[in-house]
Amino acid sequence: MKKILQSSLFLSAVFLGSAQVLESDNYNSYTLGNVSTSMTTAGQGGMNLYNGAIANYQIVAGDAARVKYLAVTGGSDGTTTSSRYVYKTGLATAWAGRTSGNNIIKGSFEVYTGTSTNKHLSGVSIFGADNGIVGIGYNSQTKTINGRAYLAITADPSQDGYYNITGLTANTYPANTWVTLGFSYNKTTGAITYVVAGNALTLSVNGASTVPGFDPAEFDIHSAPTRTSTTDPANSGPTTFGIDNYVIEASNSAVLGTSDIKKEKTSIIAIGPNPTSEYLNILTELKINKAEIFDMSGKKVNSTLEGNQINVKHLNPGSYIINLETSKGKTVEKFIKK
């Protein structure tokens, strides 16, 4: 298992064209309660669990639109051990057996934004054999939708990797709300598209490009702890979120027509690679007024922004927070130093 980070509508109006389902679930056929009886063997529906305890993964009753859904509870602190993952095996085999020409993997799902008090980033990711490819989820600290993407860095290929993406939408979403999200990755062209509540955006990042050629190997539902700012304490209680009605497909069609897709990059900020061992890149067209790094205790560490890079070689391995101020406001992201 590759761990590089720690509306019932299926977007039928957004995802068009011929497609074949590779993996899906609506959880309605499962027994309420624990997803599995073990952290080491697959449970209901072939779901595997990673991190935490059996009780952290539950099938719960929903409403008329969502009869049952998967609820995941994160840990009670801000460390990586509070992260949670749910995954099935079989995506790599299904992708390898797809119909010839169906080189676009795309997914849609509903996320329940969950806990309002503690902080979490919860959603889904598609992983390849060695790295993350694409992901999208809800950030409870900013109440916004954040993306993930593997990017090739124009100025320094050694910094290629899995990046955190903010600025996908200016909309915010409160706690305990269902939001419909989607994504696509084109193996042939490398194009990545995100869909938030029916609105599509093709990813374009200043100083970087998406990468073609990756084969999807695993679909992960995941949650990781975050903090609202560097002065906030780490999570002092559990965090929750939910997932329902997900569909992962292989298709030969792009998401919408090119005239219907928003191609806006002025608000996009990509931070990574995450994890990193030497440099943290900040890729954006926005003017960066300030960049500061803090450890998880809230202590500021020495760092200097040089162009669009921060040298982190001197940092001890572990989790850190980067606090950015741009002309569009503040961005707080967590990253891991290897």
Where in the sequence are the language-model features?
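Bacterial Sec-dependent N-terminal signal peptides
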Residues: 1-23, 258-261, 274, 319, ...
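Carbohydrate-binding surfaces in secreted/extracellular proteins
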Residues: 27, 109, 180-207
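Extracellular beta-strand elements of beta-rich domains used
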Residues: 27, 241-248
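Extracellular glycan-recognition surfaces and repeat-rich motifs
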Residues: 34-75
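Secretory/extracellular carbohydrate-interaction modules
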Residues: 69-151
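Short, aromatic/His-centered strand-loop micro-motif at the edge of beta-sheets
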Residues: 154-179
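Flexible glycan-contacting loops in extracellular carbohydrate-active proteins
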Residues: 205-244
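C-terminal outer-membrane/trafficking sorting elements
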Residues: 262-338
